Regions:
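Mid-domain, small-residue-enriched loop/turn segments at the edges of structured enzyme/sensor domains
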Residues: 59, 133, 154-216
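Bacterial Sec-dependent N-terminal signal peptides
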Residues: 1-44
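Short, well-structured active-site flanking segments
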Residues: 96-116, 163, 218-222
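Structured C-terminal helix/loop/strand segments within mature extracytoplasmic catalytic/sensor domains
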Residues: 42-51, 55, 158-159, 163-164, ...
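Beta-lactamase-like hydrolase cores
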Residues: 40-81, 257
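Conserved catalytic neighborhood of penicillin-recognizing serine enzymes
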Residues: 116-154
Length: 305
C-alpha cells in the first residue's frame, strides 16, 4: 500500500500495541535542503499513483498538503463533483456564524416534519419521523458530519444562509475553484444537479489545511468539528482503510448515485491524517465517472492514502 512515504523524509515511530512493538515508517517532507530528493520522490510517487489507477475505469484526482505546502497533485485540472464532502465546508460556515454572532452550539432549531424528506439518506428522519421537535446546532452538525445525514445538512442550510453563504465563506478563505449551488434535496433532482457542486482535490485539501492551521473560530468550536471528523462513521474502507494503526485521522466522505447506465458520478474522501509524531497532512482523493463497483472504488482510495 502507498503510505506517501516515497516523497517524505522517512521517520520511524514505535507504537506500543498490546505486548508488541510495531514499527511504522511515516513521512515528513523536508522542503529546504532536500529539494532535488523531494522532486525525485514526487516523481516516483506520481508513477506509483498512476500505476494504481492505470487500468481503472474512472478519473481519479489526488492532492496532498503537508505543512501548508502543495506537496503533490494528480489530475487536479478537472471539476470534481463534491457530493457530501461539502458538508464539511458548510460546517465551517455555520461555526463561523456561531462564533461571530456569539451563539452557543446548543442553540436550538425547530425541525418541522416537512424538513425530513422521505427519499434521501437520513438517520435523523428514521429516528424521529414525526418531526416537529427542537434540536441543537451541535446535534444537527453531528448528524450531518459523522453520519452524513442529508436532511440535517439541508436544515442547517435553511437556517444559516443557504448554499450561497457557504460558497461565499469559502471564497473569503481564498478558495476560488469551488461552486456550492444546490443543497442535498436539490441534488437529488438530476444528474446535472449532482455535478453542479464542484471543486478540485487541491482546493478541498486546502480547506482542510486552513481549518487545521488557522484559528477560524474559537478553540472549543474548532475542537468540536475536529472531533466530529474523527468520529465520522462513513467511508471506513476508503482513506481510513489504507492507514496503519496508531494513526489518527478525521475525514468527510461524499458518494453519489449511479447513472442509468451504472456509472458512479462521484466517490470522494477528504481527510487529515495525524502521524504518531504529531505531524499532520491533508489529503483529498476524488473519483468521478467510475465504471467500477463500490468495493473497487474504495480500494483505489485506500491504496492512495
Amino acid at each position: 500500500m502507498l503510505k506517501l512515504q516515497i516523497f517524505f523524509l522517512l521517520l520511524t515511530a514505535e507504537i506500543k500495541r498490546k505486548d508488541e512493538m510495531k514499527r511504522i515508517i511515516v513521512a515528513a517532507l523536508l522542503f529546504c535542503c532536500w529539494g532535488a530528493s523531494v522532486a525525485f520522490s514526487q516523481n516516483e510517487l506520481r508513477k506509483e499513483l498512476e500505476a494504481v489507477i492505470r487500468d481503472k475505469k474512472a478519473r481519479v484526482g489526488v492532492a496532498v498538503i503537508y505543512d501548508g505546502k502543495d506537496t503533490l497533485t494528480l489530475n487536479n485540472e478537472y471539476r470534481y463533483p463534491m457530493m457530501s464532502v461539502f458538508k464539511f465546508h458548510q460546517a465551517l460556515s455555520v461555526l463561523n456564524d456561531l462564533d461571530s454572532g456569539g451563539l452557543p452550539l446548543d442553540t436550538e432549531i425547530f425541525v418541522k416534519k416537512s424538513d425530513l424528506h422521505p427519499d434521501t439518506y437520513s438517520p435523523l428522519r428514521d429516528s424521529v419521523p414525526q418531526g416537529n421537535f427542537d434540536m441543537t446546532v451541535a446535534e444537527l452538525l453531528r448528524y450531518s458530519i459523522t453520519l452524513s445525514d442529508n436532511n440535517a445538512c439541508d436544515i442547517l442550510f435553511k437556517h444559516f444562509g443557504g448554499t450561497g453563504k457557504t460558497e461565499k465563506y469559502m471564497k473569503g478563505l481564498g478558495i476560488e475553484k469551488i461552486v456550492i449551488q444546490f443543497d442535498e434535496n436539490e441534488m437529488h433532482t438530476s444528474v446535472d444537479a449532482e455535478r453542479a457542486n464542484w471543486t478540485t482535490p487541491l482546493e478541498a485539501a486546502k480547506v482542510m489545511d486552513i481549518f487545521l492551521r488557522n484559528k477560524l473560530f474559537s478553540v472549543s468550536l474548532s475542537d468540536f468539528l475536529e472531533n466530529l471528523l474523527i468520529c465520522t462513521s462513513t467511508g471506513a474502507d476508503k482513506i481510513k482503510g489504507g492507514l496503519p494503526s496508531g494513526v489518527i485521522m478525521g475525514h468527510k466522505t461524499g458518494s453519489s448515485s449511479r447513472t442509468a447506465r451504472g456509472t458512479k458520478i462521484a466517490d470522494n474522501d477528504l481527510a487529515f491524517v495525524q502521524l504518531p509524531d504529531g505531524k499532520r497532512y491533508t489529503i483529498a482523493v476524488f473519483v468521478m465517472d467510475a465504471d467500477e463497483d463500490d468495493k473497487t472504488i474504495a480500494g483505489i482510495i485506500s491504496q492512495i492514502s
